[in-house]
């Protein structure tokens, strides 16, 4: 799986995961001049800004480590733009780590063993 495919696969898996846990997906890939928020979701009266980090494995580092101070600042500024457009509400920032593992062939094509780690209130 190529890196852009891994990202798309990760975001799709993240949406399925969130919906299965009662989150409503408000939008995907919200963009502002500061950056992009992968998923904007809602649960229990709060907006949840979700950064998805998809990796094939944990060989180098945990995926959430890629959400450092600079990325957090961009996400906060982008969230402020979202609030300016849609109105302020209680909110939090979550990170979803998606590890796709290695592919195995099945009768229906390739299948991936996916592991998901949800970090609520990540920053």
Describe each PLM feature range:
Residues 1-28:
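Acidic-basic catalytic patches of nuclease active cores, encompassing PD-(D/E)XK
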Residues 18, 37-63, 67, 75:
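Conserved catalytic cores of phosphodiester-cleaving nucleases, focusing on short active-site segments
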Residues 24, 47, 90:
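Hydrophobic "anchor" residues on beta-strands that sit immediately upstream
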Residues 29, 53, 94-96:
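Solvent-exposed beta-strand sheet faces enriched in polar/charged residues
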Residues 33-35:
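Short acidic/glycine-enriched loop/turn segments that link adjacent beta-strands
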Residues 60-91:
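Mid-chain, well-packed structural core segment of small domains
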Residues 85-123:
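Domain-level recognition of nuclease-like catalytic cores that cleave nucleotide substrates
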